[in-house]
Amino acid sequence: MNSKIFAVLLLLGLLSCVLSDQYCPKSSITACKKMNIRNDCCKDDDCTGGSWCCATPCGNFCKYPTDRPGGKRAAGGKSCKTGYVYY
């Protein structure tokens, strides 16, 4: 009996981990001078250790996902370049 309860609780715990939504963290910066815009990444593959490429006003940076919405994932694309971006 105890093993069945444990199995059900374990399954519920795994399900909650799999089904929980993940987001880029919300940036605390609301504006950035054009000369300070830098992209460390253009897509998730540019990041390591399970981090995502997230967009901020100062460029794209690798961040670890969070369960709180508010951030924005980097769009990437052919026009995205890493390094300092001058418009």
Swiss-Prot record:
One GO cellular component term: extracellular region
Signal peptide, first to last residue: 1-20
The entry's keywords: Antibiotic, Antimicrobial, Disulfide bond, Secreted, Signal, Toxin
Disulfide bonds: 24-54, 32-58, 41-53, 42-80, 47-62
Record keyword Signal present: yes
Tissue: Expressed by the venom gland.
Residue ranges constituting the WAP domain according to the UniProt record: 21-66
GO biological process assignments: defense response to bacterium
Localization annotation: Secreted
Principal place of residence: secreted
Domain of life: Eukaryota
MF (Gene Ontology): toxin activity
InterPro entries: Elafin-like_sf
PTM field: Contains 5 disulfide bonds.
Job of this protein: Has antibacterial activity.
Family from the record: Belongs to the venom protein 11 family. 01 (wap-1) subfamily.
Protein name according to UniProt: U15-lycotoxin-Ls1f
